[in-house]
């Protein structure tokens, strides 16, 4: 998260927690016409998977947070507040969230290039808390990336496991079942014309 997003997350986290949900992270996206402030919320880990975030949770958080932002006013100018569940391509904001999703595939965007790249895709192997880093399996190698250098990270959904894998389209044309009737022919089985 950016410094501004971290500041806002620290400000709003107690309010969100008091509503029985967890603030996963904040995205602050400034733009010339007005910024977007996006909050990602989820149910506490102890209540998963029995309970999931629904529209009512998002509306409740939006109302309470909006009132707090009006009083605290941490953002100058116009902005749009969005409150969302993490979705299947869940964003990751903290080392604890990376640890919770060890073994899952992720897309990572770095602030500064590492090995000549800023974008990676790999499996979360483990957290190196001492180094403040996440270790990924990328292209068959273990790659350690400093947490402070991670700009964005999202889980890559396993569409097959979710039962949502795209189906291969059928080839156009007539389908053959192997039980088609043969048309009568003027030829015998040997391929010679029949005598009439």
UniProtKB/Swiss-Prot annotation:
Which family does the entry's similarity section mention?
Belongs to the RimP family.
**Species this protein is from:** Xanthomonas oryzae pv. oryzae (strain KACC10331 / KXO85)
Q: What is the lineage of its organism?
A: Bacteria, Pseudomonadati, Pseudomonadota, Gammaproteobacteria, Lysobacterales
Describe its function: Required for maturation of 30S ribosomal subunits.
Source gene?
rimP
- Name of a matching Pfam family: DUF150_C
Keywords noted in UniProt: Cytoplasm, Ribosome biogenesis
Q: What is its main location?
A: cytoplasm
Q: What is this protein called?
A: Ribosome maturation factor RimP
Extract the HAMAP family matched here. Answer: RimP
């Amino acid at each position: 998260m950016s410094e501004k997003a971290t500041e806002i997350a620290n400000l709003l986290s107690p309010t969100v927690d008091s509503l029985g949900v967890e603030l996963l992270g904040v995205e602050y996206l400034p733009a010339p016409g007005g910024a977007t402030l996006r909050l990602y919320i989820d149910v506490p880990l102890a209540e998963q998977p029995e309970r999931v975030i629904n529209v009512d949770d998002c509306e409740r958080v939006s109302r309470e947070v909006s009132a707090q932002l009006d009083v605290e006013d941490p953002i100058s100018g116009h902005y749009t507040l969005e409150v969302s569940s993490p979705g299947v391509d869940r964003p990751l904001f903290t080392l604890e969230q990376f640890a919770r999703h060890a073994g899952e595939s992720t897309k990572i965007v770095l602030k500064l290039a590492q090995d000549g790249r800023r974008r990676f895709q790999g499996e979360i192997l483990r957290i190196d808390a001492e180094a403040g880093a996440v270790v990924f399996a990328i292209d068959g190698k273990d790659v350690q990336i400093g947490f402070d250098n991670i700009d964005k990270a999202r889980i890559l959904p396993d569409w097959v496991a979710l039962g949502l894998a795209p189906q291969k389209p059928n080839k156009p044309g007539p389908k053959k079942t192997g039980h088609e009737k043969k048309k009568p022919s003027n030829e015998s089985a040997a391929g010679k014309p029949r005598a009439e």
